[in-house]
């Protein structure tokens, strides 16, 4: 089923896009919620006419997104998180925390347009993608640091583990030496 989106739908498309969705998703969710209409021939003609009339407005929105992207270039964030002794974060860093840190830097961004892949669950350097417009995205580098002072490096797999001798074995060795 083809539908015309009336608003941006995350992981599907942007306003005025014609997308193909499963019948149930279109009929039971998108259309009743007012997020889409069925893409009939007449609806496509109306959409084309509306896009021609709004071409100037769409160009202005894209220009504003590009200006905001230019202002976000060069921004890097540092996020403090509670961690275990091995550097694993309790919980994870989310797009909400990225939006809050950007707000502290003076850049207001809706958390829904920030994409983090893969999930951030350890201390280190990562990149968040901010989708300001369907054609304008910005990559924001950020570092996750520990609120704790010291972090012990996790032992690599296969590293030998020192084994303490048992006291009984030491006693047997002492008896053998005494004889």
From Swiss-Prot:
UniProt biased composition (Low complexity): 157-166
Family: Belongs to the bacterial ribosomal protein bL9 family.
A molecular-function term among this protein's GO annotations: structural constituent of ribosome
Protein name listed in UniProt: Large ribosomal subunit protein bL9
GO cellular component, one term: ribonucleoprotein complex
InterPro entries: Ribosomal_bL9 (IPR000244), Ribosomal_bL9/RNase_H1_N (IPR009027), Ribosomal_bL9_bac/chp (IPR020594), Ribosomal_bL9_C (IPR020069), Ribosomal_bL9_C_sf (IPR036791), Ribosomal_bL9_N (IPR020070), Ribosomal_bL9_N_sf (IPR036935)
One GO BP annotation of this record: translation
Keywords: Ribonucleoprotein, Ribosomal protein, RNA-binding, rRNA-binding
Annotated Pfam families: Ribosomal_L9_C, Ribosomal_L9_N
SUPFAM superfamilies, per database record: L9 N-domain-like, Ribosomal protein L9 C-domain
Bias (Acidic residues) ranges: 167-179
Stretches the record annotates as Disordered: 156-179
Organism per entry: Porphyromonas gingivalis (strain ATCC 33277 / DSM 20709 / CIP 103683 / JCM 12257 / NCTC 11834 / 2561)
Cited function: Binds to the 23S rRNA.
NAD recorded as keyword: no
Ribonucleoprotein among keywords: yes
